[in-house]
Curated annotation (Swiss-Prot):
Zn(2+) binds at E182, H244, H260. This is 3-dehydroquinate synthase. GO terms for molecular function: 3-dehydroquinate synthase activity; metal ion binding; nucleotide binding. Its cofactor is NAD(+); Co(2+); Zn(2+). It holds the Pfam family DHQ_synthase.
Length: 359
């Protein structure tokens, strides 16, 4: 078992290990909660029952709230249904929300907890690789609207995060591939050892008996360091958005049918092309993006003919300032910069590079 501290105004621990449900229940008890609401997805039904058993073994009560899968469960109507259950169960300020699922469930559960009685505790138990290294750590919560992804939300740090490596054995390859994008992202912005591990043996990077536990720990440690210094994304935390400006536009264009990691992968290729065209990074670093991402099955291209729609989506990105599209870019492996003055012609050139297969 490994523990990573996330410092800041409300410090908490990220626990990485095996068979952690008893630890989750113990954490809930230490918070003084009498009951928990486990917000989860249909596919996690039997797993949720096991977590209920661990909680009830300590004399506490647990209620399962099942929400629709993926982004279909991340909207105001679903949040309202969750609050209705909390009301019927007379949830008080000492009680706890537990997320058990992927990133969408993590985001939703955090938002539900942030709003109920102006904020109650939430514990995250992420079950996908993506949520383990992304949504579960950092305190961002949110739901989607027709205007875009995560435009309604709050900053609400969890009281604890439990990454149970046993969950990974049940994941289909497509989930492992998508989650790898966020791990690789942290390699490009901060911890280049991550990149070296993927280059050394991509297959071992999917394996709990191989490099995957180290990759998860390294990625979480990067995010923990960044968010500890900038909870509300006022400055340094923005580096975690590497690949996300174009990536979120792709998700919106594809009506959220693309997996988040796949969209971020294409987003990293887009901004790497933008940086290379400006002379900020070398051809070698640009190709390193393409080689590492493609080695694990992530997309590195996007079809032509959609720039106008993607451009409009980027213009609505919540990271923009004064009407300018803002990108996190690299000036070297592990070194970031902001691009805030890219004109339409530059963006078209980067997009055309993406269309041509990144050459």
């Amino acid at each position: 078992m490994q523990t990573i501290e996330v410092n800041g105004a409300s410090p908490y621990e990220v626990t990485i290990g095996h068979n952690l449900f008893k630890d989750v229940a113990k954490s809930m008890s230490q918070l003084g909660a009498n009951q928990a609401a486990i917000i989860t997805q249909p596919v996690m039904g039997e797993t949720a029952k096991k977590l209920v058993g661990a909680i009830e073994a300590l004399g506490k009560e647990a209620t399962i709230i099942t929400v629709p899968d993926a982004e279909d469960g991340k909207n105001l109507n679903v949040a309202g249904d969750c609050w209705d259950v909390l009301g019927r169960k007379a949830f008080g300020r000492k009680d706890v929300i537990i997320s058990l699922g992927g990133g969408a469930v993590t985001d939703l559960a955090g938002f539900v907890a942030a709003c109920w009685m102006r904020g109650i505790a939430v514990i995250h138990v992420p079950t996908t690789l993506l949520s383990m290294v992304d949504a579960a750590v950092g305190g961002k919560t949110g739901i989607n609207t027709s205007a875009g992804k995560n435009l309604v939300g709050a900053f609400h740090e969890p009281s604890g995060v439990f990454i149970d490596l046993d969950m990974i054995a049940t994941l289909p390859d497509r989930e492992k591939i998508s989650g790898s994008a966020e791990i690789i992202k942290t390699g490009f912005i901060a911890d280049t050892k991550i990149l070296s591990l993927y280059e050394e043996d991509p297959e071992a990077c999917f394996n709990v008996e191989g490099y995957l536990p180290e990759l998860i720990a390294r990625s979480v440690a990067v995010k923990a360091r960044v968010v500890a210094s900038d909870l509300r994304e006022a400055g340094q935390r923005e580096i975690l958005n590497y690949g996300h400006t174009f990536g979120h536009a792709v998700e919106l264009k594809e009506k959220y049918e693309w997996r988040h990691g796949n969209a971020v992968s294409v987003g990293m290729m887009f901004v790497a092309a933008l940086a290379r065209n400006r002379g900020l990074i070398t051809d070698e670093l640009y190709l390193r993006h393409k080689n590492i991402l493609s080695s694990v099955g992530l997309p590195t291209t996007y079809p032509e003919g959609h720039f106008a729609e993607l451009y409009q989506a980027m213009l609505r990105d919540k990271k923009n300032r004064d009407g300018r599209i803002r990108f996190v870019a690299l000036i070297g492996a592990g070194k970031t910069i902001r691009i805030e003055d890219a004109d339409r012609a530059e963006l078209i050139a980067a997009y055309e590079t993406l269309n041509k297969g990144g050459v």
